[in-house]
Amino acid sequence: MVGALCGCWFRLGGARPLIPLGPTVVQTSMSRSQVALLGLSLLLMLLLYVGLPGPPEQTSCLWGDPNVTVLAGLTPGNSPIFYREVLPLNQAHRVEVVLLHGKAFNSHTWEQLGTLQLLSQRGYRAVALDLPGFGNSAPSKEASTEAGRAALLERALRDLEVQNAVLVSPSLSGHYALPFLMRGHHQLHGFVPIAPTSTQNYTQEQFWAVKTPTLILYGELDHILARESLRQLRHLPNHSVVKLRNAGHACYLHKPQDFHLVLLAFLDHLP
């Protein structure tokens, strides 16, 4: 079944935080005349935006609560992993969201996008990791093998006391997420691959064996990696597919609001 929602096309098929990084409070004060002028300006901008093609959505505007405190730290032991974490502001959901990243990004991406803050506001604990050699995580020899990458991710989740993970895996992070999925999918409550790498390393039968609820997400303008990964990921028996319109490979950057809507809908409907 195919449908459309907010510009998206969809198909249905331990270590503890160490360093506080916030919160940030933004305050505004305007007169009535300024508010009226601002409203008129926004209306004109909206009309121009609708009528003309434009750049990707601004990613610096937080969609979640700017008062959320983002914590950070390092996991213990060998090959420590740097992480950013938010705790639920309201009544906590059972699942916890673990955010990986692509080649050009790191855990800070999810803070800049407002994803961490939004998940906290919606009652989710969320942890964003810096993969080895990225951000504040040092390179690791363990990451040179498939088994080592799976073990590294499993250890990070254990050290962070993540019990019911929903793993969000864009692009390069597929090198870590897919080996972990194949070996430890019973530990995952959900899986959100975003045009991940390494799908070609596994057979149809291996994908069929994974029963984890999966949201396959990709950008309409990603004509290479998204299509390659989709061919294999479709073999996951419990999946849905969402295509973000007018978005490229890093679709969560190009369409952050659509991405957040789709992600929250998936999380909110997990058992």
UniProtKB/Swiss-Prot annotation:
PANTHER family: PROTEIN ABHD14A (PTHR46197:SF1), PROTEIN ABHD14B-LIKE (PTHR46197). GO terms for cellular component: cytoplasm; membrane. The keyword Signal does not apply. It comes from Homo sapiens (Human). The active site is at S171 (charge relay system), D222 (charge relay system), H249 (charge relay system). Its EC number is 3.-.-.-. The chain crosses the membrane at residues 35-55. InterPro entries: AB_hydrolase_1 (IPR000073), AB_hydrolase_fold (IPR029058). Signal peptide: none annotated. Belongs to the AB hydrolase superfamily. ABHD14 family. The lineage of its organism: Eukaryota, Metazoa, Chordata, Craniata, Vertebrata. The keyword Cell membrane does not apply. It is a single-pass type II membrane protein. Keywords: Cytoplasm, Glycoprotein, Hydrolase, Membrane, Signal-anchor, Transmembrane, Transmembrane helix. It is found in: Cytoplasm; Membrane. One of its GO terms (molecular function) is hydrolase activity. Glycans are attached at N67, N201. This is Protein ABHD14A. Possible role in granule neuron development. It comes from the Eukaryota.
